[in-house]
Swiss-Prot record:
UniProt: 2-oxoglutarate binding residues: K95, M134, H149, V150, D151, W167, S244, R253
Class of this enzyme: oxidoreductase
Assigned protein family: Belongs to the PhyH family. PHYHD1 subfamily.
Protein name per UniProt: Phytanoyl-CoA dioxygenase domain-containing protein 1 homolog
Length: 288
C-alpha cells in the first residue's frame, strides 16, 4: 500500500504538495475573475451561505437546482438588511457552485486532470464520479468560519465511506487566513451519521431542505491546523471532522474543491440535496 493511501486511511486526510504549478493556478484565478465579472447581480438572488445557522442554509430552489449550473452565494457580512451589497461583488462572494467542473473549460481541465486521476487510482477508486465542484473565496476580513462538520452530512452514499473531497489551495492557506483544521482519525467513528442535510420533498410551500438527526459536538482540543501552500491539495475522507476559522487577515484564501464518489457498488441517497437530472449525470473522473 502506498504511503498516500496508508496516511489517508489512518488520518482521514492527506496533504499532497505542489500538485498544480503557478501557471495552472493563475489560469484558475483568471477564469473565476471572468465568471465574477460577467455575473449580472440582477439575475441572481443574494443567497447568503452559512453553515452555522441551520435555518438560513440557502434553503431555496436557487441552491437546490445548482448541481449543473454556476451559481453565486454571498458572505453574511456582505449583504445588508435591504439585500444590497456592502462591498464590491468580487469581495462579497462566499462561494460559487456547483457545476464549475462541467461548464467552465479551465475548471474542467483542473478537475479531470491526470494528476487528480492518479490520486484516486492511488486510493483504490474504480469508478470515481465527480458529484460537485465549488470555488470558495474566504474573503479578507469577512470570510466566514465554517463550523465543524463531515462532508457525508451533506452528500450521503451507501456504503457511507465511498465519498472523498479534494481541496485545492488557490492561495496559500495559513492559520491567519483560515486554513482547514482536522481531527485526525475521526473518520473511523460513524456514531454521528444520523445527522444529515436532506431534501424535504415538500410540495406545499414549506422548506425544501432541512437538517435531521442530532447535531454532533466535537472536542475542540483535538483539532489540528493544516496550513498548505498554493497549488497543493488536501484529500478529505467523507467522514473526517474538519472546519475552518473566519479569515480575519487582509489576505484572501481562495480554494477549489470537488467531491468524488466511488460509483462501484454504491447507492447515492435520494434525499441528498444534490441530484442528477435527466440532462445531467455525474461524470466519470477517469473518462473525461
Amino acid at each position: 500500500m502506498s504511503d498516500l493511501r496508508q496516511n489517508f486511511e489512518r488520518d482521514g486526510f492527506v496533504v499532497i504538495e505542489n500538485v498544480f504549478n503557478d501557471q495552472e493556478i493563475e489560469e484558475i484565478k483568471g477564469a473565476i475573475g471572468k465568471i465574477v465579472e460577467d455575473m449580472n447581480l440582477a439575475e441572481h438572488p443574494k443567497s447568503v451561505f452559512s453553515t452555522y445557522d441551520e435555518d438560513k442554509h440557502a434553503a431555496d430552489s436557487y441552491f437546490l437546482n445548482s448541481s449543473d449550473k454556476i451559481r453565486f452565494f454571498f458572505e453574511e457580512g456582505a449583504v445588508d438588511k435591504d439585500g444590497e451589497l456592502t462591498v464590491p461583488k468580487d469581495k462579497a462572494l462566499n462561494k460559487i457552485g456547483h457545476g464549475l467542473h462541467l461548464l467552465d473549460p479551465t475548471f474542467k481541465k483542473m478537475t479531470f486532470n491526470s494528476k487528480i486521476q492518479k490520486i484516486f487510482q492511488g486510493i483504490g477508486y474504480q469508478e470515481p464520479e465527480v458529484v460537485q465542484s465549488m470555488y470558495i473565496f474566504k474573503q479578507p476580513k469577512i470570510g466566514g468560519a465554517v463550523t465543524d462538520h463531515v462532508d457525508s452530512t451533506f452528500l450521503r452514499v451507501n456504503p457511507i465511506d465511498h465519498l472523498t473531497g479534494v481541496w485545492i489551495a488557490i492561495d496559500e492557506a495559513s492559520v491567519e487566513n483560515g486554513c482547514l483544521s482536522f481531527i485526525p482519525g475521526s473518520h473511523k467513528d460513524t456514531s454521528t451519521s444520523d445527522y444529515r442535510f436532506v431534501r424535504t420533498h415538500d410540495t406545499t410551500g414549506g422548506p425544501l431542505l432541512k437538517f435531521i438527526g442530532t447535531r454532533p459536538t466535537y472536542d475542540q482540543s483535538k483539532f489540528q491546523h493544516v496550513p498548505i501552500s498554493k497549488g497543493s491539495l488536501i484529500l478529505i475522507h467523507g467522514l473526517v471532522v474538519h472546519k475552518s476559522e473566519a479569515n480575519t487577515s487582509d489576505k484572501s484564501r481562495h480554494a477549489y474543491t470537488i467531491h468524488v464518489m466511488e460509483k462501484q457498488n454504491t447507492e447515492w441517497s435520494k434525499d441528498n440535496w444534490l441530484q442528477e437530472t435527466e440532462q445531467y449525470k455525474f461524470p466519470n473522473l477517469y473518462k473525461q
